[in-house]
Amino acid sequence: MAPIPFEHALVLASVLFVLGLVALLIRRNLIVMLMSVEIMLNAAGLAFIAAGSRWGQPDGQVMFLLILTLAAAEVGVGLGLGLQVYRRHKTLDVDRLSEMQG
């Protein structure tokens, strides 16, 4: 099986990153925003893996492990905060939360 060309991996990473960014800017639900950030982090990890594979360096894999750790921490904290926000305000819509604050 032939390896995926470097340019194709970067294009895929770019498309995933842009999709995550667009979803982050358009959607106002806190859970969807967290998922969008996860997509963006995975796209960055894919770019690191592709670059490390292209130049034969293990640094891309190390950075991907760092990104996975960061993403797991972000999800844990984000979902915990989201749960508290939902319990207090009964909504996860970021715009409605901004209106409530004044």
Curated annotation (Swiss-Prot):
It is a multi-pass membrane protein. Its main location: membrane. Disulfide bonds: none annotated. This is NADH-quinone oxidoreductase subunit K. One of its GO terms (biological process) is ATP synthesis coupled electron transport. The keyword Cytoplasm does not apply. Keywords: Cell inner membrane, Cell membrane, Membrane, NAD, Quinone, Translocase, Transmembrane, Transmembrane helix, Transport, Ubiquinone. It comes from Methylococcus capsulatus (strain ATCC 33009 / NCIMB 11132 / Bath). NDH-1 shuttles electrons from NADH, via FMN and iron-sulfur (Fe-S) centers, to quinones in the respiratory chain. The immediate electron acceptor for the enzyme in this species is believed to be ubiquinone. Couples the redox reaction to proton translocation (for every two electrons transferred, four hydrogen ions are translocated across the cytoplasmic membrane), and thus conserves the redox energy in a proton gradient. One of its GO terms (cellular component) is plasma membrane.
